[in-house]
Structure formats: C-alpha cells, structure tokens
Regions:
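Intrinsic-disorder/low-complexity detector
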Residues: 17-204
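Short, positively charged low-complexity motifs
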Residues: 1-10
Length: 204
C-alpha cells in the first residue's frame, strides 16, 4: 500500500491530514495524473452506460470538493490501508450526493458538510446513508445494487492505477497521488449522478 500507518497512529490522522491538505493543495504537478485517471474512468463508465463519453460537471460541484476533502481526509487516511477500495468508492458516493444536492436545491444544500454524508455508524455506512437518504434509493433496490457494483468496479480500477505509479510509501508523492485519486473519484461520482439525472453537455 501507500503506507499511511504512521499518519493514523495515536488518533492524530485528522490533524496531520488537515495540515498536509492545506500545505499541498496548491501543488499541481499531479494534475496530469488525475486527468489521466479521470479519462480512464470515463471510458469505463461509458462502457457501462453510466456516461456518454464525457465528464459532466458543474463549477459549484467541483468547488465543493475542497471543503469536503478537508473533512473527509481524516477518515480516508485512517481507513485506506485496510480498506483502500472502500475509501475510493465512498469518495464517489460523496460526489453523487453533492450532485444530487446541486440538482435539488443548491442554495439549501451548498453549505452541508461531511457530517451530513455519513450515517449513524459514521464512515462505515456512508454508502447506505447516501443511497437511501440522499439519492432516495431503497437499499434493497436494483438501483442501489447497481450503484454499489459500479462504484466497486471503478474503485478497484482506480486503486490498481494508483498503485502502478510506484510512489514510495509515506512520501509526499504518495500523498499527492492519494489526494488526486480521491478528487478523481469524487468528480466521476458526481458525473455519474448528473447523467442519471438526465443532464447532458450541449454546445453553446
């Protein structure tokens, strides 16, 4: 793995991660990595009927990730070594939730934080809370099962892609790859939901 064990020791993962995010956020040397990963995931999503060959987006949704990432980073770092693909899939669920909020009433939901995305068990049932309470799909529905299956597939591919970068564990490069992978999964999750809500790109 990318070796975040030392960050998670003694319950200090959140504080350390917040500082790292603030310090590293302006670094852009890994933007091409993120773009390449997004392009790859768009192809996979299109093959599964989740997209039409392009990444739907909105400036509001994209900008919202920065504040959510600062809150989410503590849980993401703590859980990543044991459950890397879960962390990546959960990030896509967050993107789907924000896209749903944006569609429903952005003025009402734009200030919602990470705590609004987790269920009674916190990080552990984020997927169920988003699916049932935000996207409004019963947990036993085909829609819920399809979302879970698709996001698990995409998370697995994204994890393989990030591992192939060969970053040294616990290095700055490893952390940058990690944060850009989260950003990519968020953007892809949002685009999947926008497509499900029947948005589409149009020439102007």
């Amino acid at each position: 793995g990318l070796g975040f064990e030392s960050l998670a020791e003694h319950g200090k993962a959140s504080d350390v991660c917040l500082k790292l995010f603030c310090y590293l956020w302006t670094m852009d040397r890994f933007e091409k990595y993120e773009d390449d990963l997004v392009d790859r995931l768009v192809v996979l999503c299109t093959g599964r009927g989740l997209m039409d060959g392009m990444l739907l987006s909105s400036p509001d949704i994209t900008a919202k990730w920065e504040s959510l990432a600062l809150e989410y980073s503590g849980d993401a770092v703590r859980e990543f070594n044991a459950y890397p693909e879960v962390v990546l899939a959960w990030t896509a669920y967050i993107g789907m939730a924000v896209a749903c909020w944006w569609d429903k009433d952005w003025g009402r939901y734009k200030d919602q934080g990470y705590s609004s995305l987790v269920g009674p068990r916190g990080f552990d049932d984020l997927d169920e809370h988003v699916t049932r309470d935000i996207l409004k799909h019963p947990l036993n529905s085909k829609e819920a099962a399809d979302i879970a299956g698709n996001l698990a597939f995409l998370a697995g591919d994204a994890y393989s892609f990030m591992m192939r970068q060969g970053a040294e564990p616990q290095s700055v490069d490893a952390f940058n790859i990690f944060r850009h992978t989260l950003s990519a999964m968020y953007r892809v999750g949002a685009a999947i939901e926008l497509k499900a809500l029947r948005y589409r790109m149009e020439k102007i």
